[in-house]
C-alpha cells in the first residue's frame, strides 16, 4: 500500500473537496476537488459564503471558499460549475486550473516530496486561511478575507512511524526536518493581512498588510458599510467599500475570536472572545 507522499493520482473520495448533497435523499449532486492528491495538509478548514453575484453580465448563485490551499474558489452552487480560482497568497503546489475540465487544479509535480527530497511549499502547513471567518458585504460587493502568507519545508520519513519526530509526521510535532525559512524579511513572502476581494473579478480591491495570519480572529461586516476585524491585540474598523481606517481599539489580550454584533434594548454592541497567551483556561470577554 502506498503512503500519502507516494500517491500522485487518486479518485475524489480521498481528496479535499467541496460538495453538494441533496438534503431530501442524502445523495451527492456535485463535487469539486480543491486540492487533488493533497500531500501538504491543505485541507478546507475555512467556511463557505453563498451569494448572488453578477459575473460577466450574468446573475450567478455562487459559493465561495478560501481554504488553507491559498486559492480563492468561486463555483456555481446550483450545479458545481467552475467559475474562477485565483491564488490570494503565493502558492507553488498548483500551476493553474484546467477550465476544460471544470477548473481541475493542475498539480505541480515538483511539489511532491519523499525520503530523499525535501520541498519548500507555499503556503505552509498552517494554511493561507484557516478557521478565522471571512465575510461578505452585498452592498459593497466585497469579501473580507484574513490571510497568512508563508512556507513550510516538507519531507518524508523512511518508514511510517508515529515517533519519527523532526516534523516527519505532521505540522506542530517536532518542527521542520530542515532549517526553516525566516518568516519576516524584504525578500520573503511571510506576511499576514486582510484582503477585500471582488467576487465579480476574483481580484483584490484593497488590502491591509500585517493584520492577519495566525493571530487574526476573523471579520464581520454590516449594512452600515463597516468591516470589523480582530487581529493581534486590536479591534480594527474599516469602511467596507474603500478600506479606510476608522478605528484601532487595543484590548491588550491575545488570541481573539471573530467579532459578532447583537442588540440589547435598542443599543447595538460588538463583542468578541479573547484569551491570554499563557493559560487557555483564563478566558476573557
Place the predicted regions along the sequence by residue.
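Single conserved hydrophobic/aromatic residue that forms the stacking wall/gate
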Residues: 1-16, 280-284
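Long, low-complexity segments enriched in small/aliphatic residues
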Residues: 116-120, 126-150
